[in-house]
Amino acid sequence: MSAETTASGYIQHHLQNLTFGQLPNGSWGFAHSAAEAKEMGFWAFHVDTLGWSVALGVIFILLFRMAAKKATSGVPGALQNFVEVMVGFVDGSVKDSFHGRSPVIAPLALTIFVWVFLMNAIDLVPVDWIPQLAMLISGDQHIPFRAVSTTDPNATLGMALSVFALIIFYSIKVKGIGGFIGELTLHPFGSKNILVQALLIPVNFLLEFVTLVAKPISLALRLFGNMYAGELVFILIAVMFGSGLLWLSGMGVVLQWAWAVFHILIITLQAFIFMMLTIVYLSMAHEENH
């Protein structure tokens, strides 16, 4: 790209989000550097992350709505086949892993799997195409733009916190506030002696609280870390491809395609893991005796 003159600048530009927030002069606008984005503080928005995640969510809804409207008992079309396979796969996963009763879990699991998969799949688009399109549309040759929402920890943590909120909600709904507090304070260590049990409460609470909080953090960081690393590999291959070394230029296309083929497994696996852990965590929240 013309906006970057060095490999370091190229990498930094591709790893920076399109950030909107309050500028140092008090006005609101887009940041044009990582330092400027940092100065915007907590209330800055990653416009590219929000835009792509919402757009892909809408695409998911429209595709499945279209398939539902055109569903037939006769010979199904390609879209209906795809949707039926997805629904059957997710439904089987929920039946195998979720041991409670809730009409919400299967639709939630389906939404998570397909939505995360679509966001991950954008990583297969060549790294320069979408940023260059953003430059052409905006007319700004220095504007940063990241299309893979799951390489932004804000997106993955936001989804994980939503799952965490459901865990807390169902834990209290199924077990009651007393049961939920008891789960945090009376396990894993217990004693028939009331005094000893009282002394164990702080230890139990510390262990269970850390375990509880670790669920959304690990859920978010696992998805973010794997997708960020995959995106970085694509960027590094692009840097080598454009380095001017002829022997590397010949290998660039091969490396890109080889990593893309392998990355198909990664993007699918990460969507599956996020979905399965969500199902397992919510199943644990529905269990009376944890």
UniProtKB/Swiss-Prot annotation:
GO terms for cellular component: plasma membrane; proton-transporting ATP synthase complex. The gene is atpB. F-type ATPases have 2 components, CF(1) - the catalytic core - and CF(0) - the membrane proton channel. CF(1) has five subunits: alpha(3), beta(3), gamma(1), delta(1), epsilon(1). CF(0) has three main subunits: a(1), b(2) and c(9-12). The alpha and beta chains form an alternating ring which encloses part of the gamma chain. CF(1) is attached to CF(0) by a central stalk formed by the gamma and epsilon chains, while a peripheral stalk is formed by the delta and b chains. The keyword Translocase does not apply. GO terms for biological process: proton motive force-driven plasma membrane ATP synthesis. NCBIfam families: ATP_synt_6_or_A (TIGR01131), PRK05815.1-1 (NF004477). Keywords: ATP synthesis, Cell inner membrane, Cell membrane, CF(0), Hydrogen ion transport, Ion transport, Membrane, Transmembrane, Transmembrane helix, Transport. It is a multi-pass membrane protein. The keyword Repeat does not apply. It is found in: Cell inner membrane. It holds the Pfam family ATP-synt_A. This is ATP synthase subunit a. Key component of the proton channel; it plays a direct role in the translocation of protons across the membrane. SUPFAM superfamilies: F1F0 ATP synthase subunit A. The chain crosses the membrane at residues 44-64, 104-124, 161-181, 194-214, 233-253, 260-280. Belongs to the ATPase A chain family. One of its GO terms (molecular function) is proton-transporting ATP synthase activity, rotational mechanism.
